[in-house]
Amino acid sequence: MSASLETIQLPHLPSNLPVHIGLYRDVNNAPFLRQQLLSGNADFEYAFIDASMVFSRAHVLSAIFRAVNDSLNGRLKSRNVHSEIVFSLSPANNIAESFRKFGITDLTKDLLVVKVSVTPDITHNSVAEHLQQSIEGLSVPFTDTSLSEIGDVAKIKKAYKLGSLSTAQDDDKRRLELSLIGAIALRGAT
């Protein structure tokens, strides 16, 4: 089993929609996983996110909340809640661009995997078992420490057009995190 798979109940969302999150390093089969997504294999309906584009837990949890909330309110702009999570990470309204920047590629080595329990048969154990069988990589804890080792701050700042924002001090890192969360919340607002 994936010892590091974390199941989270997001506040302000129904209790029957827990979210399962796994973080993997040194993934060797990204092309296979990406192909499963592209072919529409329902067994691989996950949000496969390039972890180098994730700054913190709060950053990705904000995108998950937005996607699940949009799903519950009939406002999905993509195929399903899992693709919407990847789309929600993007500050732009272009779905294809969001997948290029934030989604899994054939070269992805560090992978964040998210699964929302949209049906009762999706449980912590079923997700952990499937990921253990499917992902060739090292499962690591989904922590801010792990994400800070993986995240490419320069790429993240470029994607969000925040190049001038410093990240030298803890206050600067907090300001960047709040800017990322704000971009997620405001994308598409008119």
From Swiss-Prot:
Transmembrane segments: none annotated. It is found in: Nucleus; Chromosome, Telomere. Disulfide bonds: none annotated. InterPro entries: CGI121/TPRKB (IPR013926), CGI121/TPRKB_sf (IPR036504). It holds the Pfam family CGI-121. Component of the EKC/KEOPS complex that is required for the formation of a threonylcarbamoyl group on adenosine at position 37 (t(6)A37) in tRNAs that read codons beginning with adenine. The complex is probably involved in the transfer of the threonylcarbamoyl moiety of threonylcarbamoyl-AMP (TC-AMP) to the N6 group of A37. Cgi121 acts as an allosteric effector that regulates the t(6)A activity of the complex. The EKC/KEOPS complex also promotes both telomere uncapping and telomere elongation. The complex is required for efficient recruitment of transcriptional coactivators. This is EKC/KEOPS complex subunit cgi121. It comes from Aspergillus clavatus (strain ATCC 1007 / CBS 513.65 / DSM 816 / NCTC 3887 / NRRL 1 / QM 1276 / 107). The lineage of its organism: Eukaryota, Fungi, Dikarya, Ascomycota, Pezizomycotina.
